Every structure is written in structure tokens, then in C-alpha cells.
Amino acid sequence: MPEETLLAFDFGEKKIGIAIGNTLTRQARPLEIIFSETRAARFGRIGQLLQEWQPQRAVVGLPLTLDGQEQPASARARRFANQLHGHFGLAVELVDERSSSMEAQQLLGTHADDDAVAAAVILQRYLDTLSQP
């Protein structure tokens, strides 16, 4: 697989956690949290990040129930992924995000804003699947 830069998104209606990583190092790290309720502001900032980091692909967390079923938030995440693809022409992968926020809180050791760390957990899961046969 050629080297790719990836941005990951932990989508929420009021804030979006963002992480960055690449397929060469197979490491993900938190980047930032977008705090905005307006679609225009969210996509404006996302456009700036895409310009700055030039990712080849995006990874969006797909919220599922504990037994792996879709829920109302799943449709919102899918819509966001479709908008990323439509607005920016970016290839988008959906990744099961079950327990990513809980894992992020454990990593942080606090209940602080964990959205960017949750995005890094989601991206790391995706990167880890790339190394599996």
C-alpha cells in the first residue's frame, strides 16, 4: 500500500474530534476538536485542515450499539461521511467506534474533552487493520 496521510473524525452534532495519522508509521495522534453548531463553520474548518494536511483518505467513526447494530447516530455519521466525500472529493472509510470514547477517557485519565483522542483511537483501529493479513 502506498503511503497515505489520513484524517479521522469522531463526529458529534456539537463538536467533532479530529486525529491525523499515516499508513507508513501506522500511528494516529489527536489533532483538534471543532466546537461549532453551524455546518458552514464546521466544513470551513475541515476545509482548512484538508488544505494544511493534504490527506488522501478520511476515516469516520460509525457509532453502533454494543451488539453491533446501527442506531440513530449511525445515520448522522454516515451523512457526515457522505458530505465529506461530496464536498471535498475525499475517499472515506467508516470504522466501528464502539467504546472509543471510553478508551479515550482511560488514556486521558479524566472526563475532559476526549473527542480528538477518541478520533485517534478510531484511526488507530483502522491503521491496525491494515497490517493484518
Curated annotation (Swiss-Prot):
Keywords: Cytoplasm, Hydrolase, Nuclease, Ribosome biogenesis
UniProt entry tagged with the keyword Cytoplasm: yes
Source superkingdom: Bacteria
Subcellular location: Cytoplasm
Top-level enzyme category: hydrolase
GO biological process per UniProt: rRNA 5'-end processing
GO cellular component: cytosol
EC number: 3.1.-.-
Family matches, as SMART domains: YqgFc (SM00732)
GO MF term set: nuclease activity
Xref: Pfam families: RuvX
Family matches, as InterPro entries: RNaseH-like_sf, YqgF, YqgF/RNaseH-like_dom, YqgF/RNaseH-like_dom_sf
HAMAP family with a match to the protein in the record: Nuclease_YqgF
Job of this protein: Could be a nuclease involved in processing of the 5'-end of pre-16S rRNA.
Family: Belongs to the YqgF nuclease family.
Protein's UniProt name: Putative pre-16S rRNA nuclease
